């Protein structure tokens, strides 16, 4: 026969949580929220989610109430261990003490260093770890003048990072939001009498762009030892290999943010 109406629902069970327990270098954002998945629908229950240190969270759930995506209302503190607890109360028992059914922890990503490392390999590794995407959709090129690092992103995810050389003080690379206007595998600069391989203009007048280390007609190429410090006349230089990689990846209209 049918079960008695008073028969209680089995307690909800957490199937999975992202970020997983004990994960480090976590960056919670709208594209990477906290996700709690239950074994079955939790419609018959009140579910409580809590972070410690305390942080107010907003959430949305799927129609079946088996998956909840949580976002803190304000960004979580950098380099901090957070505990996530999930608890429930039965319907009609809103005043009851919540029963805890899950606890896990994660560590947020540390703040970016104030001073960038002189070792360019270390600096690149730091940039890959600490550069936050400023645009969440499509392709975009991030150029950090302070670190002399270019980071390329697609749909909010890091694709690669490269050491660059931007404009000398007084001949600074302009800051702001731009887009790739035109491109050519090899461009001749009448002004400086040299070739600029893998040219990608970022300003409509074509005065500023991204290109490989320049070379003279006789074949002499600017050395890679200048990468990592601002030595150009305003353009953004990439090393051999890196320039071809960015050129092959980017499109006309790809956005560029210089900061």
Describe these PLM feature segments.
Residues 1-125, 130:
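Acidic, low-complexity Ser/Thr/Gly/Pro-rich repeat segments typical of extracellular/periplasmic
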Residues 32, 36, 83-84, 148, ...:
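Solvent-exposed, polar/charged alpha-helical surfaces in well-ordered, non-transmembrane soluble domains
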Residues 35-37, 83, 140-142, 151, ...:
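Soluble periplasmic/extracytoplasmic beta-strand elements of cell-envelope proteins
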Residues 38, 72, 108, 164-166, ...:
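Hydrophobic residues in beta-strands and at strand termini
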Residues 40-42, 72-76, 82, 86-88, ...:
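A mature extracytoplasmic/lumenal domain signature
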Residues 43-47, 148, 254:
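Short beta-strand/loop motifs in extracellular/secreted proteins, especially
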Residues 126-169:
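A structural motif detector for short, solvent-exposed N-terminal "entry" segments of globular domains
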């Amino acid at each position: 026969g049918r079960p008695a109406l008073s028969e209680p629902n089995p307690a909800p069970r957490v199937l999975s949580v992202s970020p997983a327990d004990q994960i480090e270098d976590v960056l919670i954002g709208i594209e990477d929220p906290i996700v709690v998945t239950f074994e079955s629908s939790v419609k018959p229950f009140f579910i409580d989610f809590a972070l410690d240190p305390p942080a107010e969270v907003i959430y949305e759930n799927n129609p079946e109430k088996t998956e909840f995506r949580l976002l803190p209302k304000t960004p979580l503190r950098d380099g901090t261990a957070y505990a996530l607890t999930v608890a429930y109360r039965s319907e009609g028992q809103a005043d009851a003490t919540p029963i805890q059914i899950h606890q896990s922890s994660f560590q947020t990503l540390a703040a970016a260093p104030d001073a960038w490392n002189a070792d360019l390999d270390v600096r690149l590794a730091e940039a890959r770890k600490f550069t936050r995407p400023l645009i969440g959709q499509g392709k975009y090129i991030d150029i950090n003048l302070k670190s002399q690092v270019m980071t390329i992103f697609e749909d909010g995810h890091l694709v690669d990072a490269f050491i660059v050389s931007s404009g000398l003080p007084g001949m600074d690379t302009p800051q702001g939001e731009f887009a790739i206007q035109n491109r050519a595998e090899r461009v001749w600069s009448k002004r400086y009498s040299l070739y600029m391989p893998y040219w990608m203009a970022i300003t409509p007048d074509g005065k500023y762009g991204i290109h490989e280390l320049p070379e003279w007609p006789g074949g002499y190429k600017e050395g890679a030892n200048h990468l990592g410090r601002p030595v150009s006349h305003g353009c953004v230089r990439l090393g051999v290999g890196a320039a071809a990689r960015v050129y092959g990846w980017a499109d006309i209209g790809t956005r560029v943010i210089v900061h």
